[in-house]
Amino acid sequence: VGSEMCIRDSLVINTHVCRGNYHSAYFSSGAYDPVAEKLFGEENVNAYYLEFDDERSGGFEPLKYVSGDKKVVLGLITTKSPVLEDKQTVINRIHEAAKYIPLDRLYLSPQCGFASCEIGNKLTEEEQWAKLALVKEIAEEVWK
């Protein structure tokens, strides 16, 4: 029982709401609104990794249901396209999300993995590193 409690106390549980990431294509779309209250308010997790890389994800208003001190990782950088996002647009979107959840509980990441399946996405290794460099640059500016 002692070791079980130790593990439970140190275990971090996160949820990634994935909309598909097969060879640069998605298989699901839609805003978080229909599931937000139950998912964000009742699920017993430490953080959410959420896809917000395009209009199919909807707006940030559902984040108002994130309960307690849960963290939200905003997947604002797409892994489906090699085109780099505009830095200021991403920064503006982070601040828009901060209207619903405090900035100190928000984080930035790519919307999903670069190779969520064996085939991977239509990005070169250099393009992937450029995306990660952009994440780092934006994070250093927003959370200085």
Where are these regions (language model features)?
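Aromatic-lined carbohydrate-recognition surfaces of secreted/lumenal glycan-active proteins
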Residues: 11-22
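Secondary-structure boundary elements
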Residues: 7-12, 141-144
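Catalytic-face loop-and-helix region of soluble metabolic enzyme cores
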Residues: 20, 34-144
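Ligand-binding pockets and gating/stacking loops
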Residues: 27-31
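Short, small-residue-biased leader/transition segments that mark boundaries at the very start
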Residues: 1-7
